[in-house]
Amino acid sequence: MEFDRMLIRYGELSTKGKNRKQFVTKLAQNVKRAMTDLPEVRIHGERDRMYIILNGADYQLAEERLKPIFGIQSFSPAVRVNLDLEEVKAAALALVQDAHEENGTFKVAARRSHREFPLDSNEINQEIGAHVLQNIEDLTVNVKNPDVKLTIDVRKEGVFLSCRTILGAAGLPVGSSGRAMLMLSGGIDSPVAGYLAQKRGVEIEAVHFHSPPYTSEQAKQKAIDLAAKLAKYSGQVQMHIVPFTEIQEVIKQQIPESVIMTVTRRMMLRITDELRRKRNGLAIVNGESLGQVASQTLESMLAINAVTATPIIRPVVSMDKNEIIQIAQKIDTYNLSVQPFEDCCTIFTPPSPKTKPKLDKIEHYESFTDFDALIAKALDNIETISVNVAETVQVKDEFADLF
């Protein structure tokens, strides 16, 4: 069966009252970005549902693109026919014939919002159900648990028919809750944190710290590939790759070994916060899970967070490693994350890092080095790329005026 549209049902958008239009607009933008390589597709957002007019595009590809987009409760491949009973009968029969299996069951569920249509909902159920039964011999009715549920929606603009309902990703449209910077390493935790933030409507821009020659191009590519996995949920993720070699080398030379990790994280957070300010972000997201490593004790978090007053969102803070791994496997980032390429969080790691660093001592150690100049230099040399769900494209000079 050739479907001509996708019918999208909203998730939590149904509870958003006066802000509903804003949420629908944001969802439409995300769907459009996810369909960038399907230029023939047209998107029409309405108060209670959204239609994607395929115009000949591959509906199966469109279906795959819709599944991970947050803000969609469910969707159905559908066909539209005119407000003509015979056309409805023909389309209904074709849909059920295509969907049913031998000795299967079905039901018709009609809804008529267009009152000028000559039959009411019950009459449509009876008329279409009888027509289908007369033309498919091995089919019976089961109104409680049918193998095939034919939905018919009679509206002023036409009659819409579908036989499948596919669960969406639910949540809120990415971007509806504002923008945040995701500190994206090559590990397991930060992509999961990015996924969970997006599910609550946060638009993420990834920040990755790259320290060649200590970290390889493969490590950089792994981070880009992880960002591409996250782009599925919004259509696109902006990624900022920060040159971090010089800062790490200075830290290694000037800072006591036991607090190298703490100072490194503080510099990362300062750079991320400056990017957030320039990009009009509202928060920073990271993959910290309380107590997993030395830098993730409450004392370490306190010392690291002291460089900023910006809200830090930690979606996985209370999860154990197995819980995080389960989500990573679900969103298809786990196999990428465990590839054995070093990132800058693992180089120069001391054998016995302090788990309870003192903020006053950390600030004292830092005071002997002009980290402000090093941070400004790193910001001036950031590489920004746009990671798209369909392809990865390097962005040249797109944010030149910001740095």
From Swiss-Prot:
ATP binds at residues 183-184, 208-209, 265, 287, 296. Its EC number is 2.8.1.4. GO terms for molecular function: ATP binding; CCA tRNA nucleotidyltransferase activity; tRNA binding; tRNA-uracil-4 sulfurtransferase activity. It is an enzyme of class 2 (transferase). Residues 60-165 form the THUMP domain. It holds the Pfam family ThiI. It is found in: Cytoplasm. The keyword Repeat does not apply. InterPro entries: Rossmann-like_a/b/a_fold, ThiI_AANH, ThiI_fer, ThiI_N, THUMP_dom, THUMP_ThiI, tRNA_STrfase, tRNA_sulfurtransferase_ThiI. Keywords: ATP-binding, Cytoplasm, Nucleotide-binding, RNA-binding, Thiamine biosynthesis, Transferase, tRNA-binding. It catalyses: [ThiI sulfur-carrier protein]-S-sulfanyl-L-cysteine + a uridine in tRNA + 2 reduced [2Fe-2S]-[ferredoxin] + ATP + H(+) = [ThiI sulfur-carrier protein]-L-cysteine + a 4-thiouridine in tRNA + 2 oxidized [2Fe-2S]-[ferredoxin] + AMP + diphosphate; [ThiS sulfur-carrier protein]-C-terminal Gly-Gly-AMP + S-sulfanyl-L-cysteinyl-[cysteine desulfurase] + AH2 = [ThiS sulfur-carrier protein]-C-terminal-Gly-aminoethanethioate + L-cysteinyl-[cysteine desulfurase] + A + AMP + 2 H(+). GO terms for biological process: thiamine biosynthetic process; thiamine diphosphate biosynthetic process; thiazole biosynthetic process; tRNA 4-thiouridine biosynthesis. Transmembrane segments: none annotated. Pathway: Cofactor biosynthesis; thiamine diphosphate biosynthesis. GO terms for cellular component: cytosol. Catalyzes the ATP-dependent transfer of a sulfur to tRNA to produce 4-thiouridine in position 8 of tRNAs, which functions as a near-UV photosensor. Also catalyzes the transfer of sulfur to the sulfur carrier protein ThiS, forming ThiS-thiocarboxylate. This is a step in the synthesis of thiazole, in the thiamine biosynthesis pathway. The sulfur is donated as persulfide by IscS. NCBIfam families: tRNA uracil 4-sulfurtransferase ThiI. Belongs to the ThiI family. This is Probable tRNA sulfurtransferase. It comes from Listeria monocytogenes serotype 4a (strain HCC23). The lineage of its organism: Bacteria, Bacillati, Bacillota, Bacilli, Bacillales.
